């Protein structure tokens, strides 16, 4: 398998584009390794990315799971810029597949609370026949910035959902009330 182009990522404390570097050669990988502080890293293949989606779910102690509408994420310089959510944005079969993977992951980890699983959706025109079209990119065992849209756009926000799980209350309604675009504004 080709090593380059790839993304060199620190195995700990990397997020929002931090702790990673795109590398096109062994020389660039060595330089990036130095710039990352020579900490433990992994080299990921650069995938034919079409877009990224977030699946946000909540799982309670009775093992019930609710899933929020899937959002499509846009990044600028490796940092989430916006999440767009409306009913026909992502093909329904892809939504179902991603949600099922996320639910199996939460159940397999015996996780309780709100969790986000980000998936890369790969460009099918560039895939080889045996390659999956979804690749899990990030698992966040907490309310996630791509789910901040739930504050105003769903019946029950991801934050209220977390409280419901911890308090032993029934899970809330995740229905989308309005089509939404969430802008991620960061402070220093």
Give, region by region, the residue ranges found by the protein language model.
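Short, well-ordered secondary-structure micro-motifs
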Residues: 53, 81-83, 136-138, 149-150
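Active-site "cap" helix and flanking loop/linker of ATP-utilizing ligase/carboxylase catalytic domains
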Residues: 97-117, 140-188
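A structural signal for short, well-ordered beta-strand segments
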Residues: 55-57, 70, 117-119, 139, ...
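Generic enzyme active-site microenvironment
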Residues: 7, 116, 136
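Intrinsically disordered, low-complexity coil segments
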Residues: 2-3, 89-92, 122-133
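Short acidic-glycine loop/turn motifs at beta-strand connectors
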Residues: 59-64, 76, 121-128, 186
């Amino acid at each position: 398998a080709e090593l380059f182009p790839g993304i060199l990522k620190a195995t700990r404390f990397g997020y929002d584009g931090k702790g990673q570097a795109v590398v096109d050669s062994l020389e660039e990988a060595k330089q990036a390794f130095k710039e990352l502080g020579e900490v433990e890293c992994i080299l990921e293949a650069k995938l034919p990315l079409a877009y990224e989606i977030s699946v946000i779910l909540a799982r309670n102690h009775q093992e019930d799971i609710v899933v929020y509408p899937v959002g499509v994420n846009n990044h600028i310089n490796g940092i989430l810029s916006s999440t767009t959510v409306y009913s026909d944005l992502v093909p329904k079969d892809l939504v179902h597949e991603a949600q099922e993977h996320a639910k199996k992951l939460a159940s397999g980890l015996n996780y309780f609370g709100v969790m986000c699983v980000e998936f890369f959706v790969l460009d099918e025109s560039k895939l080889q026949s045996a390659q999956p079209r979804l690749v899990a990119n990030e698992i966040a065992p907490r309310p996630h910035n791509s789910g901040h849209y739930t504050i105003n756009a769903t019946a029950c926000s991801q934050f209220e959902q977390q409280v419901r799980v911890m308090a032993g209350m029934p899970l809330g309604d995740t229905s989308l009330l309005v089509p939404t675009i969430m802008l991620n504004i960061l402070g220093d």
